[in-house]
Amino acid sequence: MDVKIAKTAGFCWGVRRTVDKVMEVADQHRAPVVTLGPIIHNPQAVARFSEKGVGTVNGIGEVTDGTTVVVRTHGAVREELERAEARGLEVVDGTCPYVKYPQAMAQRLSREGYHIVIVGDANHAEIKGVISYSEQPCTVVKPGGPVPEIKAKKVAVIAQTTCIGAEFERVVGVLALRHKEVRAVNTICNDTEERQADARALASEVDAVVVVGGKNSANTRHLAEICRAIQPRTWHVETEAELGAAWFEGCRVVGLSAGASTPDWVVEGVAAWLRALR
């Protein structure tokens, strides 16, 4: 089977930066090292960190004194970081710089009197962190969902870094017709936009698509949605163990894309499995 791999498949710059930082901290510290939440949304990568002795906690309350805490790629809720500082814990900030941008915008624009609207998943760690930096209540609009009525004269719209651009545009358009002043700040990561454009192009050129990445990874799920809209024979898997040969009957070329948190070795494992098909 011929396999066409998307140019952008695998770790983005921000994730690779955080992964390298975790490995460096694990190698240099004798004291316990934990990440505040899964460092990235990929079970295989998290398992590798565990083998290095890096644990995972859900909150600072679970951390023992003397432990080094690494903030994950998606950032953390501001109050949790304040608790860590108050306890004198060593904190290594692995937050992606692109995630820090919507955090800063939420804080700055809320101080300027704007009601903050975030296009994204309210349950995602990144959005929880962004909300914590706003100094006023926020409204989170789920991609594809209705835009609620907001009682505010000034509205500022930002987005989850992995949001689909068309959804951000849709929400801004709806709000622009309702409010006298709407400020739109595009906080979607450039890598996300490039990866999604790459996925669209790939899906239009192949007989089937496999998107590789954690089932809990928002950007990977979005890639699968984008590909499936163009090529119905699209599957989202975490590893080659989930693949079935019958899926690819009649296919000559299979496209392979992967989320920003998918390790290279996982992508290669899926590619090797596909190439072995006859």
Swiss-Prot record:
Isopentenyl diphosphate binds at H41, H74, H124, S217, N219, S261. Dimethylallyl diphosphate binds at H41, H74, H124, S217, N219, S261. It catalyses: isopentenyl diphosphate + 2 oxidized [2Fe-2S]-[ferredoxin] + H2O = (2E)-4-hydroxy-3-methylbut-2-enyl diphosphate + 2 reduced [2Fe-2S]-[ferredoxin] + 2 H(+); dimethylallyl diphosphate + 2 oxidized [2Fe-2S]-[ferredoxin] + H2O = (2E)-4-hydroxy-3-methylbut-2-enyl diphosphate + 2 reduced [2Fe-2S]-[ferredoxin] + 2 H(+). Gene3D superfamilies: 3.40.50.11270, 4-hydroxy-3-methylbut-2-enyl diphosphate reductase, catalytic domain. (2E)-4-hydroxy-3-methylbut-2-enyl diphosphate binds at H41, H74, H124, T161, S217, N219, S261. It comes from the Bacteria. The active site is at E126. Binds 1 [4Fe-4S] cluster per subunit. GO terms for molecular function: 4 iron, 4 sulfur cluster binding; 4-hydroxy-3-methylbut-2-enyl diphosphate reductase activity; metal ion binding. Its cofactor is [4Fe-4S] cluster. Pfam families: LYTB. HAMAP family: IspH (MF_00191). Catalyzes the conversion of 1-hydroxy-2-methyl-2-(E)-butenyl 4-diphosphate (HMBPP) into a mixture of isopentenyl diphosphate (IPP) and dimethylallyl diphosphate (DMAPP). Acts in the terminal step of the DOXP/MEP pathway for isoprenoid precursor biosynthesis. Belongs to the IspH family. This is 4-hydroxy-3-methylbut-2-enyl diphosphate reductase. It comes from Anaeromyxobacter sp. (strain K).
